[in-house]
Amino acid sequence: TYGDDKDVIALEINNEPHHSGPRASVADYIRRMITAVRSTGWNKPVFYNISESPSYAGVVAAADIDGVSFQWYPTGLVANRTLKGNYLPHVDQYKIPFGDSLPLFRNKAKMVYEFDAGDVMGSYMYPAMARAFRTAGFQWATQFAYDPMATAYGNTEYQTHYLNLAYTPSKAISLLI
């Protein structure tokens, strides 16, 4: 099981949920999901995503979760062209949404479940983004790219992300920094 896999260190209950309706119903949904996960014997951290439903941030913060997850696309997504220019000012700081207004977020683990400087081919963005994550207090960040080698040359899976060791080696190495 995933719970027994030593390489699986946590889980996120729902990727980019778009909640609607009464807050009490959303709180109940989150509680039931957490209960279901933990009833399997899962004892690793449980995260919940807040990127797409900011008006429900208070409900998520009050939930019995170990951490909150966010996304970051500071240059946007799918420009359908390579962006030119200096985008470092876009990644100078990651301000955690709700970090100041919801104290319940402060003591929870924080992860960025997906990020990228979409459509930027330069290798300078990832080290700057990593610095912004560390400064903001994130413990974990996952870059978003998933082209298999057979199609990696053409970046077919999600055209805004182009990262692999074979065809964008300087970007790939910068991700390690």
Give the location of each predicted region:
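Active-site groove signature of glycoside hydrolases
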Residues: 1-24, 112
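Structural preference for beta-strand elements that scaffold enzyme active sites
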Residues: 7-12, 43-47, 67, 109-112, ...
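Active-site beta-loop-alpha junctions enriched in small/polar residues
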Residues: 13-16, 51-53, 73, 115-116, ...
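Surface-exposed amphipathic alpha-helices with a cationic face
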Residues: 27-42, 99-107, 116
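Short, acidic/polar
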Residues: 50-61, 122-130
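Glycoside hydrolase catalytic-domain groove-lining segments
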Residues: 58-119
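Substrate-binding cleft of secreted/luminal carbohydrate-active enzymes
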Residues: 119, 123-177
